[in-house]
Design a protein with these regions (language model features):
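Active-site-adjacent beta-strand anchor residues
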Residues: 13-16, 42, 95, 183
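Glycine-/small-residue-rich active-site loops that bind phosphorylated ligands and cofactors
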Residues: 15-18, 44-47, 101-102, 188
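Short catalytic-site patches enriched in acidic/histidine residues
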Residues: 16-28, 46-67, 74
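Phosphate-binding glycine-rich loops and their immediate beta-loop-alpha structural context
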Residues: 1-40
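Glycine-rich beta-strand-to-loop/alpha-helix junction loops that act as flexible
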Residues: 9, 35, 40-52, 62, ...
């Protein structure tokens, strides 16, 4: 659905089992079909069944494999060679398997890359200032995207509260939210009533 909002042509190659050979075959198939970008979900962490980064390294180049981002730390970004001596390459984005982490990394990284690839002029994130109605826990050293519900008060100021569960595996909070609460890399815990940045859903990145 997030890809369709960008009006790109989507080629769904289905579900690939946790097997290096099957994954390699699927990625080779994708680039053979002249895909400009290949996006996968899951298999990018360091578990026994996580093969994406190794296969990606064999078929192309891994630019980076993790981010100081929550949710969304495991993320593989790089390129896949066309193979058989064909020129050029396809961009590759290996997103986390947890659905919320996948949505966050798509919004934070993939959306802008695909729009740029399509030749669009990509504006900076449309951030707004809101005042949190609750204290927010945060550890400095990583950027955090909390799912939030923003409302506008009579005085014109935005107020925001966390939307349900903030687990990266829980879709309920994401479904209830209308924005991300973006807490910067160096920020620590936030007191109730403090200003924070929010990124409304549907804002261009």
């Amino acid at each position: 659905a997030m890809l369709e909002q960008l009006h790109v042509d989507v080629l769904d190659l289905g579900i690939v089992r946790d097997d290096p050979a099957a994954l390699e075959a699927a990625l080779r198939d994708a680039v053979a079909r002249d895909a400009d970008a290949v996006i996968t979900s899951g298999g990018v962490s360091v578990g026994e069944a996580d093969f994406t980064r190794d296969v990606m390294a064999r078929l192309g180049e891994v630019t980076f494999a993790s981010l100081a981002l929550r949710p969304g730390r495991p993320l593989a970004v790089g390129t896949l060679a066309r193979g058989d001596g064909a020129p050029g390459h396809a961009l590759f984005f290996g997103l986390p398997g947890n659905p919320v982490a996948s949505a966050v990394t798509f919004d934070a990284i993939v959306r802008a890359a695909l729009l740029t690839l399509a030749g669009a002029c990509v504006p900076p994130p449309a951030m707004y200032t809101a005042y949190t109605t609750q204290a927010l826990k945060k550890r400095a050293g990583r950027t955090e995207y909390l799912r939030g519900i923003a409302t506008r008060a009579a005085d014109g100021r935005w107020h925001v509260a966390p939307a349900g569960s903030q687990s990266s595996a829980s879709l309920s909070g994401l479904a209830a939210a209308n924005c991300f609460i973006v807490l910067g890399h160096d920020a620590a815990a936030v007191d109730a009533g403090a200003p924070v940045d929010i990124l409304p859903f549907g804002s261009p990145i």
